[in-house]
């Protein structure tokens, strides 16, 4: 009897703790009046296709964001399957306006698209396209595209750059396993991402000489590691895996929001111990950032697909990042 009471008390204690944790997750940081949610929703929120995205919509509504940025924003595979959809059967990107309206966002923007992995922005405020970037089609191809949009919020113009850098250890477009292996040994995937980030920055933030005094943010799945986390990774100082974020740190006015808000901490954004997702900001916007955190809750915790389909996870192989601003 005594053991049962102890077990019951422990269970109640855990339930109360989880209640307050989840309640805190829903609330904005004190003083914040604008919330951004960024998330790579793997394969166009494939996990949400079997319930008409009801759980996804409910989660977004709970967070009450003003701006959302979604990476991998296109439907690709049939429900509970790894069979590619026919283009005419893909719900997203064509119906993002319909889906976003369900969580209270009447405005939708799709960035530059050249394959099945574009990024989308949805918002409570109008979104203006500045540029959709896919590269020059020759020596500089931005594999998954990039978007540069502006949103005016409380009289402040926010520049938002969305991206999703190339995913593999090898360079894109190679025809055989042998060629890909040789490319990976030459670290050509890292070098390709370094080319992409330079091209993106040169065509966005670098076009504004005064960007360091403006409100800019750049976010997405960078598929690369940061030197700021290298106490955790322990890569050699000259490792090519660090190229992308070294470029951002040395050549742009951007600052790593998670690092600035939580110095010295490692914030995992994947289903394995790594941070591939980042939100970068210029100093003026960072100074108006009340909180930036990786979201951990029941819904967003990555769970391997029970069928072991490809590399599919539910609801995604990435975790969201939530940012609260006082604008």
Locations of regions flagged by a protein language model:
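Short catalytic/ligand-binding loop motif for oxyanion handling, primarily in non-cytosolic enzymes
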Residues: 45-46, 76-79, 116-120, 168-171, ...
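Soluble or luminal CAZymes and related metallo-dependent hydrolases
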Residues: 48-55, 88-92, 141-144, 185-201, ...
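Structured beta-strand-rich core segments of catalytic domains in phosphoester-bond hydrolases
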Residues: 71-170
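Active-site beta-strand/loop signature of hydrolases that rely on acidic residues for catalysis
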Residues: 35-41, 59-86, 122, 149, ...
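N-terminal, active-site-proximal structural segment of metallo-dependent hydrolase catalytic domains
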Residues: 2-102, 113-116, 317, 324-327
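Metal-dependent phosphoester-hydrolase catalytic domains
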Residues: 7, 132-133, 206-217, 223-327
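A solvent-exposed, charged loop/short amphipathic helix patch at secondary-structure junctions
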Residues: 170-191
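Active-site-proximal beta-strand elements of phosphoester/diester hydrolases
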Residues: 33-46, 133, 157-167, 182-186
């Amino acid at each position: 009897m005594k053991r049962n009471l102890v077990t019951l008390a422990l269970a109640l204690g855990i339930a109360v703790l989880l209640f307050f944790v989840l309640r805190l997750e829903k609330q904005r940081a004190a003083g914040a009046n604008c919330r951004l949610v960024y998330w790579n929703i793997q394969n166009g929120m494939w996990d949400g296709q079997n319930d008409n995205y009801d759980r996804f919509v409910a989660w977004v509504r709970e967070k009450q964001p003003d701006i959302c940025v979604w990476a991998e924003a296109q439907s690709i595979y049939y429900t509970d399957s790894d069979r590619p959809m026919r283009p005419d059967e893909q719900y997203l990107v064509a119906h993002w306006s319909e889906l976003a309206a369900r969580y209270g966002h009447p405005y939708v923007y799709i960035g530059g698209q050249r394959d099945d992995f574009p990024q989308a922005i949805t918002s409570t405020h109008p979104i203006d396209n500045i540029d959709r970037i896919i590269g020059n089609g020759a020596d500089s191809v931005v594999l998954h595209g990039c978007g540069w949009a502006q949103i005016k919020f409380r009289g402040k113009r926010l520049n938002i750059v969305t991206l999703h850098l190339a995913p593999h250890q090898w360079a894109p477009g190679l025809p055989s396993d042998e060629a890909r292996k040789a490319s990976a040994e030459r670290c050509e995937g890292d070098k390709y991402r370094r080319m992409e980030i330079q091209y993106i920055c040169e065509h966005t933030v670098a076009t504004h000489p005064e960007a360091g005094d403006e409100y800019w943010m750049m976010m997405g799945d960078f598929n690369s590691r940061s030197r700021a986390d290298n106490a955790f990774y322990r890569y050699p100082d000259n490792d090519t895996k660090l190229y992308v974020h070294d470029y951002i740190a040395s050549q742009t006015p951007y600052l790593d929001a998670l690092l600035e808000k939580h110095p010295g901490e490692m914030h995992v954004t994947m289903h394995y111990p790594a941070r591939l997702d980042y939100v970068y900001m210029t100093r003026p916007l960072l100074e108006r950032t009340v909180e930036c955190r990786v979201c951990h809750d029941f819904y967003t915790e990555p769970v391997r697909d029970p069928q072991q389909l490809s590399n599919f996870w539910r609801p995604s192989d990435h975790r969201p990042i939530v940012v609260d601003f006082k604008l």
